[in-house]
């Protein structure tokens, strides 16, 4: 009944083509049969709509249960080796060793490197759940995000929200959303340079000969690398704009 009522509203709003449905976050092998049953229960009703799920277990994609996986960045390697037609990445609370994330405790380069990684590995999108979650886990009670940044101890600080509630209900930026903006700006600049000069030129800026490779668990660990890399990209763009 819900889907039958929802679909006409999506059409009316003109967003049905950009709407995504999902069955369950991070299904495990123990949940294979129940996930399959849940998907089959709604598959006919969602025919023609895009479906995706957060996923770490390649078997769900390999057996056709998840056609568009959104992979945890610390489990993405099998998906890169046998790549789906569309591949998104994500991080949340479990991605705290080595890989990019946006926790308050982490240095800024670990947040900003995401844009460079997305370009190199040609990810189609990126997902994170927490923009302005100002509650304890399960929304049992509200919290003051200026005093509590971890959903009352449920998640690492920085995971539940990227902006603070400001005056007149306008969002106040955090340093982390500024770093995310820089990451996406890096990605846009790289894509633009690729249009002008080709992918090889961009990759030479990212991984100059003799330099450290950019991977998901191993990458240059300094903001200086990112600043210099972006300067190289900008210079290459400027050369072609004259």
Where are these regions (language model features)?
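Catalytic-core regions of glycoside hydrolase
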Residues: 1-140
